[in-house]
Amino acid sequence: MTHFSGKDPFVNMDDIFNQLMANMGGYRSENPRYLVNGREITPEEFQHYRQTGQLPVATTKATNSQMLTPKADSVLTQLGTNLTQEARQGHLDPVIGRNKEIQDTAEILARRTKNNPVLVGDAGVGKTAVIEGLAQAIVNGDVPAAIKNKEIVSIDISSLEAGTQYRGSFEETIQNLIQEVKEAGNIILFFDEIHQIVGAGATSSDSGSKGLADILKPALSRGELTLIGATTQDEYRNTILKNAALARRFNEVKVNAPSAEDTFHILMGIRNLYEQHHHITLPDNVLKAAVDYSIQYIPQRSLPDKAIDLLDMTAAHLAAQHPVTDLKTLETEIAKQKESQEKAVAKEDFEKALAAKTRIETLQKQIEQHNQSQNVTATVNDIAESVERLTGIPVSNMRTNDLERLKGISSRLKSHVIGQDEAVAAVARAIRRNRAGFDDGNRPIGSFLFVGPTGVGKTELAKQLALDLFGSKDAIIRLDMSEYNDRTAVSKLIGTTAGYVGYDDNNNTLTERVRRNPYAIVLLDEIEKADPQIITLLLQVLDDGRLTDGQGNTINFKNTVIIATSNAGFGQQDTETSESNIMDRIAPYFRPEFLNRFNSIIKFNHLQKENLEEIVDLMLAEVNQTTAKKGISLTIADDAKAHLIDLGYNHAMGARPLRRIIEQEIRDRITDYYLDHPEVKKLQAILKEGQLVIRQNDQ
């Protein structure tokens, strides 16, 4: 007699057992059935029976929960999504760091009355994730006994209204939904954006039609319906709480944004899902950068949503740059081989099934090798580039670990702002202190009051600071305070309040511009001309780094640099000897509490004639940049430069007269020569008989 050892390559006992159980309605059948002593039990109870040898005590509630399953044509099946079933099938993402909210929600659901929780929190904090976590907890049995056999069904409110154009259709749909829930006995409804139930389905007050909230109230009060809702704080206050009869039937569960550490753990928990989806490797430092950059550069949104979106955006961008073409083919082939294997087992063709199994193993090895060789690894710089694409902030040029840039900020500013070394050094010290992390985090990056005569470089220093910090001279929100010299101009800063014209249109206000561009220089030009009420508002910005607009939104100024300029106390007759005490000179123009709010009050000195030698080179470099667009190069002789300085120097007016002279003597003459000789591309400016002349450069 031949002894069967189980090692026959064509016969596998596992395949025989699985096929036998499938034919008996057990393993791998569409509806597994387990009968013990004539009693049908669930797969979980059968597993318990195999381990202990004892059948669990039968309960009517458990039996009912198994038998009363929604029909295929029911409202629940057509309009709802069974989150508990998706959790059983492993289709839901893991939920991390929300144990408290899940526990609070489960405890409210386990109450005898008023067991309808509403999750309230800002957009993106993870309210829906809490419900998905609750569904997973129900599947795992980590919930109170009262809700162990419950099924959470998500209902889209808009789908309830679809197709109910005839009078009474909406009410009939809702009544059918309530009846199905009552008959099932184990259904918990989940309404996302639950504030929409107020007014949903209702028409005019004369038609007699009822809204969704009015229909649900009796069922909620009698406990016939268990409901979970999710909405934002503003919508909950403006809709649910205004309806006292509806509000008392709900219990609020606050969902706050997770901390940076919790968000990092959330990203670690879902990392595999995004790596498999995009075929991109996401190391820990990339996850940390996604959290840090989203907090720092996307303040208007909430964690963890903004960090997850930033990570997803980065992975999608890298996947688009490194497309994977043959991986889908391998996965499709594996699916075909699995189907072929199952058909072969069903026909008891074990030789063919073994061949398919071998082919599947080979394909899986190819995918593993493919992943190891083809997967692209994301870097912190990729996250920075994603932030730059999303917000326009040049993060790659603002890396906080670039200590060399902080060390050289003073020399870079001095190369463009001439003759104001003390002012530049004071600004550089404040910026270094903040960017190195040794400053108060709630105030702006820096707040400065530039005082001094006109034309000495106050505005130019602000432009160069914007270029060095934020990568562009255009990163300046410039306000001419002469336009804010009356009390009504407050609306230009924060917008109008409710009831006034322009309440909904605050696009050009300071608060709205900072909200859209949180990394910028806020330049308050000629601050002494502003109304005292404007100064009062600015006190809060300088001290707390925030300002509340007319619609109640708090705008964060902590990533801005506030620069106010003034030439108050500096007239045309000023001399160097009269500039003894800067505070004595500006005190008559500003309130003490306003001056005390600035990090530094910086005095700008009059320019000397030797300073203009460097300034004229900078201005002529700008002229060369302009002519280069036409393909023209310009050379200027030293005597021509000296002539420009002699014409443009004015001790009281600063460098502005020099700019005018260059426009008249250089730009205008180049224009005239170009119109007469458009073919000439090399020009030279020389001094001839006391006059500046433009001619062709033959060298």
From Swiss-Prot:
Coiled coil: none annotated. GO terms for biological process: cellular response to heat. Keywords: ATP-binding, Chaperone, Nucleotide-binding, Repeat. One of its GO terms (cellular component) is cytoplasm. Residues 380-570 are annotated as: II. Signal peptide: none annotated. The keyword ATP-binding applies. PROSITE patterns: CLPAB_2. The keyword rRNA-binding does not apply. ATP binds at residues 121-128, 452-459. GO terms for molecular function: ATP binding; ATP hydrolysis activity. InterPro entries: AAA+_ATPase (IPR003593), ATPase_AAA_core (IPR003959), Clp_ATPase_C (IPR019489), ClpA/B (IPR001270), ClpA/B_CS2 (IPR028299), ClpA/ClpB_AAA_lid (IPR041546), ClpA_ClpB (IPR050130), P-loop_NTPase (IPR027417). Residues 76-325 are annotated as: I. Gene3D superfamilies: 1.10.8.60, P-loop containing nucleotide triphosphate hydrolases, UVR domain. Belongs to the ClpA/ClpB family. ClpC subfamily. This is Probable ATP-dependent Clp protease ATP-binding subunit.
